[in-house]
Amino acid sequence: QTMTIKGTVDKTAISLFLLIIAGYYSYTITSPTLMIGGFIAGFITALITIFNKKSAPITAPLYAIFEGLALGGISYMYAQQFEGIVLNAVSLTALILLSLLMAYRSGLIKPTENFKLGVVAATGGIFLIYLISFIGSFFGMDLALLNPANGSMFSIIFSLIVILIASLNLVLDFDFIEEASENGAPKYMEWYAALSLIHISEPT
């Protein structure tokens, strides 16, 4: 059996369902341990999937559950500080996903090689910034740029850039799914693509 677009959509729907159920559970019991454990387990599961794609039928559903636990906990924390932020984040994510899918299918956005290189490079740059911030936090260094809650215009602009780059990564996923399906990729790649989609689509 080979990968199909319909199969990928089905696997993505299953993954989202698992993520939502786990997220709701984590949101209601408000356990910091569960939230942190979800982040760590999700990260490890994602790494396993990246280096062993054949494991995706097992690791992708697990990743969805772990990330649901993590996102449910962090959503509760933000909801206590900023009223309505969780609903707004979920709504914005859904609108971005739908809009980009329509733009991709209509040909308005074409993932050329330069486009792909640019998105990958920008994503890598953002990752490095967050990595430096994470390491710096152990030494008392705080990058205010990464905190839009401080009201700084630079922080807000940076956050918008991060959202834009994360959104453009969805276009790369759409292109990958279409090409892989046309080229007869193995069936397990449906789960791999589903993991990639839910990872990028997570509200931030």
For each predicted feature, which ranges?
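Small-residue-rich segments of transmembrane alpha-helices in multi-pass membrane proteins
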Residues: 64-77, 120-131
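C-terminal ends of transmembrane helices
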Residues: 44-57, 100-111, 174-176
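Interfacial loop-to-transmembrane junctions
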Residues: 178-197
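Short, hydrophobic transmembrane alpha-helix segments
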Residues: 23-32, 51-54
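Cytosolic juxtamembrane amphipathic/interface segments immediately preceding
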Residues: 2-8, 182
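Cytoplasmic-side transmembrane-helix entry/capping segments in multi-pass membrane proteins
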Residues: 58-67, 87-91, 113-123
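Structural signature of hydrophobic alpha-helical transmembrane segments
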Residues: 30-40, 83-95, 156-166
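Residue-level detector of conserved catalytic or cofactor/ligand-binding positions
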Residues: 198-204
